[in-house]
């Protein structure tokens, strides 16, 4: 079955839709890619999607976390070594670049790579050769390099901790993965996806989430992004004693960190009273406007966020006089 990018990168926010389209275009090209995004946004998922949609899809995809391997071992891990190259090298060993030959290697957290090793990586990108530690022979490899970082490598270049020539060689195509707080409209979709996976593992247990709890998840900023949301849904499902995740189950830090969806209305009663219809219309207008902002102008996603049918949402939109961003909304009408 062909790899489906939309199943790996779930969401309907314009940012994720554009990302999926970019992956499709980049996958077929034999260029290096630099993926930047906060921790937990899914940079490895993006890299794997590029690999799986590329002509190299039947070959190896080798992820390497440069921050998780001690600096003195990273060169040997990546390039391999000859017997006796260093203390403990009892035999020769291929490196991960050779393992990824004809496939793709992901160098995650590449900003942690020692600057001396960066020069050796640059030669791989320019000449396509790998020289194991302790060897005077170079081996030719055909490997696509994708790099990822949760920090701005441009700043690292300015500080002198990252080679400028390697930086430009890596970001032939730069990809930025948006944090989850910038595409809140996808939180219900992601939550349901994670719950569905849990249901598949435990088919006898049907777990749902209350509307109030979903609003709290939507309102939270998720500093750990999609990974944090996934872990939270898993945790809540495990601790759920019945079939519904409700507000009482949410941790205090999540509830406290959830921002109000819209500013409160300040109502002052006087002798003449208030016009309740006008107040309701004003509140509806604020909520609709906030939902449209969070969904990038996507009416369908905004309607779902507010629990409304599309026709009802459109009617309220007209009644409240809210103008949706036309440039974004046109893409969903086609």
For the regions a language model picked out, list residue spans one by one.
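Bacterial C-terminal helix-turn-helix
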Residues: 48, 268-334
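Nucleotide-binding/hydrolysis machinery
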Residues: 2-17, 21-24, 54-59, 134-144, ...
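Short gly/ser/thr-rich secondary-structure transition/capping motifs
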Residues: 84-91, 127-132, 155, 268-271
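Conserved RecA-like P-loop NTPase ATPase core
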Residues: 19, 41, 64, 78, ...
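Conserved helical "switch/dimer-interface" subregion of ABC/ABC-like ATPase nucleotide-binding domains
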Residues: 22, 53, 81, 120, ...
């Amino acid at each position: 079955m062909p790899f489906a990018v939309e199943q790996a990168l779930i969401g309907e926010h314009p940012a994720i839709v554009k990302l999926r389209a970019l992956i499709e275009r980049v996958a077929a090209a034999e260029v290096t890619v630099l993926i930047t995004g906060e921790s937990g946004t899914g940079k490895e998922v993006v890299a794997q999607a590029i690999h799986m949609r590329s002509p190299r899809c039947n070959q190896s995809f080798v992820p390497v976390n440069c921050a998780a391997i001690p600096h003195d071992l990273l060169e040997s891990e990546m390039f391999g070594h000859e017997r006796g190259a260093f203390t403990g090298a009892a035999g020769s060993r291929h490196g991960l670049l050779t393992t990824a030959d004809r496939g793709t290697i992901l160098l995650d957290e590449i900003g942690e790579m020692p600057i001396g090793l960066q020069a050796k990586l640059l030669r791989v990108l320019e000449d396509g050769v790998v020289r194991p530690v302790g060897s005077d022979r170079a081996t030719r490899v055909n490997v696509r390099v994708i790099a990822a970082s949760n920090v701005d490598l441009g700043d690292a270049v300015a500080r002198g901790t990252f080679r400028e020539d390697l930086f430009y060689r890596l970001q032939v195509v730069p990809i930025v993965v948006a944090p989850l707080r910038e595409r809140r409209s996808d939180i219900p979709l992601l939550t349901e996806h994670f719950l569905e996976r849990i249901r598949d593992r435990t088919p006898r247990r049907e777990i749902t989430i209350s509307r109030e709890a979903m609003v709290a998840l939507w309102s939270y900023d998720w500093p750990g992004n999609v990974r944090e949301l996934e872990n939270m849904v898993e945790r809540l499902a495990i601790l759920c004693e019945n079939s519904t995740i409700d507000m009482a189950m949410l941790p205090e830090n999540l509830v406290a960190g959830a921002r109000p969806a819209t500013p409160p209305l300040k109502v002052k009663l006087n002798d003449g009273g208030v016009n309740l219809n006008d107040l309701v219309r004003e509140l509806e207008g604020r909520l609709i406007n906030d939902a449209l902002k969070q969904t990038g102008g996507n009416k369908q996603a905004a309607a779902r966020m507010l629990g409304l049918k599309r026709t009802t949402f459109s009617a309220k939109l007209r009644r409240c006089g809210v103008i949706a961003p036309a440039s974004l909304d046109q893409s969903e009408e086609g």
